[in-house]
Amino acid sequence: MNASRSIFTVIAAMFVAAAAAPAHAIQFGLKDGPGAKFNNDDLALMMARVDAGLKSPTEGEVLEWKNAKTPASGSVVPLNKLTWNGMSCRRLRITNVYGEQKAQSVYKFCEKPAGKWKLVGPDNE
């Protein structure tokens, strides 16, 4: 499984968890947020930018995406790299838009020994 597919699986799981756990849904902005309306193509476009953000050497670079077939769009901004619990991590600001609805949060991803990235959760630091 490549890193993009692994991250896609994590984000998809996050959407499922949001539907099952209303408190987390509010925190992530997924239950009633724009991401709840994303189709598979929207998610794939977003995940390609998440993958690019994790690999980007540049902090603050805005990586935008848009699905021409839906009102879905967004951006990923790579923030700082850090060490957390002994793992190499990266913070990303992820903005999701669906029509007029917009949500933005900062998430922490950490690289596992096999080179796969894992979503650790929202980053409140």
Tell what function each PLM region has.
Residues 113-124:
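Short beta-strand edge/turn micro-motifs at domain boundaries
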Residues 21-67:
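N-terminal trafficking/processing presequences and adjacent post-cleavage segments
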Residues 69-88:
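Surface-exposed, charged secondary-structure patches
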Residues 9-18:
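Bacterial N-terminal signal peptides
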Residues 76-81, 93-95, 105-110:
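Hydrophobic/aromatic beta-strand elements that line small-molecule binding cavities or substrate pockets
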Residues 60, 87-89, 104:
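Extracytoplasmic
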Residues 64-65, 91-97:
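Short beta-strand segments that buttress and anchor functional surface loops
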Residues 1-5:
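Positively charged n-region of N-terminal signal peptides that target proteins for export
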